[in-house]
């Protein structure tokens, strides 16, 4: 049995057509089903529907053989028990710092609000910058507006939400897309099956990119 961990939303919607190229189609619509384990048209493949931030945990610990996760999630997770063999080139966006539009660069210790705490620590450590990191789970844009933080670190797609709240994107930390991740033990135990799937997905991505 091959178990693939996916999260609902944009990543799931963009991943399903790629899996279909490999003949893997869920027998129920994951967006409408309440089931968290969904069979597919291949008897030996099932889908696990989990939170986006939990995908690498399920894969690293072997509860899933493969998964699809955003590079932002993988950067924050930082686990070592994963292979990352393929950039699926879907759900593309940017991980950036942002601050109040036109505000001067803060002097001294910087206050940064983000849910990407580990990413923020590494980013500012590389700059040698002293920071206080404030963990938030949502509505990041509020933090600079109410003086909770000087800057935020968040995923930016169009930047419209930032601009609507008087903020501007500033420094690019990473360009983000969704990646296929594979459990290391599964890759050894089911190498032929998983490698075949990786190759099929790679061909589908390249074909879509050429098109």
From Swiss-Prot:
Q: Which GO terms describe its cellular component?
A: cytoplasm
What interactions and quaternary structure are annotated? Answer: Heteromultimer composed of HisG and HisZ subunits.
Keywords, in A-Z order: Amino-acid biosynthesis, ATP-binding, Cytoplasm, Glycosyltransferase, Histidine biosynthesis, Nucleotide-binding, Transferase
Q: Which CDD domains match?
A: PBP2_HisGs
Record bears the keyword NAD? no
Q: Function, please?
A: Catalyzes the condensation of ATP and 5-phosphoribose 1-diphosphate to form N'-(5'-phosphoribosyl)-ATP (PR-ATP). Has a crucial role in the pathway because the rate of histidine biosynthesis seems to be controlled primarily by regulation of HisG enzymatic activity.
Which organism encodes this protein? Pseudomonas entomophila (strain L48)
> In terms of one coarse class, where is the protein primarily found?
cytoplasm
Q: What is this protein called?
A: ATP phosphoribosyltransferase
Q: Name one GO biological process term.
A: L-histidine biosynthetic process
In the record, what terms sit under GO molecular function? ATP binding; ATP phosphoribosyltransferase activity
- What's in the domain note? Lacks the C-terminal regulatory region which is replaced by HisZ.
* Name of the encoding gene: hisG
List where in the cell it is found: Cytoplasm
What Enzyme Commission number(s) appear in the record?
Answer: 2.4.2.17
Family assignment? Belongs to the ATP phosphoribosyltransferase family. Short subfamily.
